[in-house]
Amino acid sequence: MLSQAQLDEFEKNGFLKGDVVLGDDEVEALREELDKVMNGETVARPVLNRNMLESDSPYDNMKMIASERVVQIVNIWMASDRFLKHAAHPQICEEVAQLSHTNSLRIWHDQIQYKPPVTGGPTAWHQDHPLWPIIQPADLVSAWVALDDAVIENGCMWMVPGSHKWGNHQRYLSSTKDFKPFHKQPEMLPNNAVVEAVPFEIKKGQVGYHHCLTWHGSPHNRSEMKRRAIAVHYMPGHTRYEPVGEHVMLSYVNVKPGELLVGDHFPEVFNKAKVQI
């Protein structure tokens, strides 16, 4: 459970470093599962498995020759019971519920991001919720767990403190040559907005939380180290299906616009009144 000081820090900054929640054996087990999914060794498949910098096809076999890549796997929990169990991690879910001010949580979707050594590419500055144009309101919180130490040298995430309070600015976000964020029309920002990024280094097995409107991104991995992580994007129980655009999860929605987003592909993983899965 998070302390009041931690809750206040998240409210102020839009991100928070949590505890080390996975031991070495648990991390290694998830790494092995990840390798199986990437190599196509599982019967079930995730929703998406691709190089973010190269392809938009629904499923790629990861045997790529691109000079840079960021391996993205969406909903690895659908291909791996071990990752489903991770998504229902009791401490993570309890703390996300605190940060989301909710008594229940469902998986919106999860996401592996793997930046291989030397050739790991950047992830552009962005806000999550504007890229999810089928759900409202913007109350989601993500739990990002490092499967390798994520440090400046291997392309850790960077965050802009307080940016979750500024609204939707996704279309105006860009970066300098040295990966500093900037806003294409800064006059649209609040008068007190300070666009200054800070590194969000996360230890292997540690969890980091961020709000769905927090500006974040990550630069190249030019080191000899891998940078693997599993992010689970959790939606509070009051999240509704409000489609205004396309999304990879759209085909899995079986409710009407305006209704709560529920269903087998959006499993409940936390409820104070029920036993968790």
Give the positions of each predicted feature.
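Glycine-rich phosphate/pyrophosphate-binding beta-alpha loops
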Residues: 128-131, 140, 215-221
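Non-heme Fe(II)/2-oxoglutarate
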Residues: 40-44, 48-49, 59-62, 169-174, ...
